Regions:
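Mobile active-site "lid"/loop adjacent to the S-adenosyl-L-methionine
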Residues: 125-154
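Class I SAM-dependent transferase core
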Residues: 2-44
Length: 247
């Protein structure tokens, strides 16, 4: 399908099942955290109805369409230009029957879905609180990185309302927010079930973490072996190469 790109847009190869992504060169491009989250969530059952909260350019949804047999994924994105870019990626990959964009704030999702109606939720939310960090970035990057339009509690409360009982939220976040996240998950009856820290090297501090939390589940947390990105020589580890479909 022919896609009309704006001057600031490019098409990148996701190097997985011939999937491609449209990216804004001046905006917020996806990183390894999204790729690892898509792999972490690939256990999502077939025929599932899935939500991607804060879909950005749609990379998580595109990858999950390739990695799972989900029935439908809805990508929620508040920024109109990012939502339009995500739609271009959907068109480019001919995924219109499986991936739909909702250009709205996640706090308005009760207008689109009934409570207890979603099989799985994924999210790579803004990592920084609204009052933290330097803000000399473009508006696009500010909204992607800082909790300006919705905070972490909004993401968790919305997930709790919309998920069916015993269905799961998959999220990637930064270690400094782990205590906040655990408190909010417990508050909204989302039980942390699986946690994996991601490190650049074996001897480095965690860079971010991947977490699965299940609605109304019993309390039992499985902490997995850390995921190491690089060997000591700076090359990717075998696990990362496998995730990137290189081996």
């Amino acid at each position: 399908m022919d896609i009309k790109l704006n001057e600031n847009e490019r098409i990148d190869d996701l190097e997985y099942k011939n999937l491609k992504i449209v990216q804004d060169k001046d905006g917020f491009c996806f990183g390894i955290d999204s790729v690892l989250l898509s792999d972490f969530a690939k256990e999502i059952r077939s025929k599932s109805i899935v939500l991607d909260l804060g879909t950005g350019n749609g990379v998580l949804g595109i990858l999950l369409c390739g990695k799972t047999k989900l029935s439908k994924i809805y990508g929620v994105e508040i920024q109109e230009d990012m939502a339009n870019i995500a739609q271009k990626s959907i068109n480019l990959n001919k995924l219109n029957d499986r991936f739909e964009i909702i250009n709205d704030n996640i706090k308005n999702l009760n207008s689109y879905f009934k409570n207890d109606s979603i099989d799985a939720i994924i999210s790579n939310p803004p990592y920084k609180k609204d009052n933290s960090g330097l803000k000399n970035e473009s508006q696009k990057k500010l909204i992607a990185r800082h909790e300006i339009t919705a905070n972490l509690e909004d993401f968790i409360s919305v997930s709790s309302k919309l998920l069916k009982s015993n269905c799961s939220l998959y999220m990637v976040h930064r270690p400094e927010r782990l205590a906040d996240l655990f408190y909010l998950l417990k508050k909204y009856k989302l039980e942390p079930k699986k946690l994996r820290l991601v490190q650049s090297f074996t001897n480095s501090k965690p860079k971010f973490f991947l977490i699965k939390a299940t609605k109304n589940a019993n309390s039992f947390l499985n902490i997995e072996q850390p995921l190491i990105i690089y060997n000591s020589d700076g090359s990717y580890t075998d696990e990362i190469l496998k995730i990137y479909n290189k081996i």
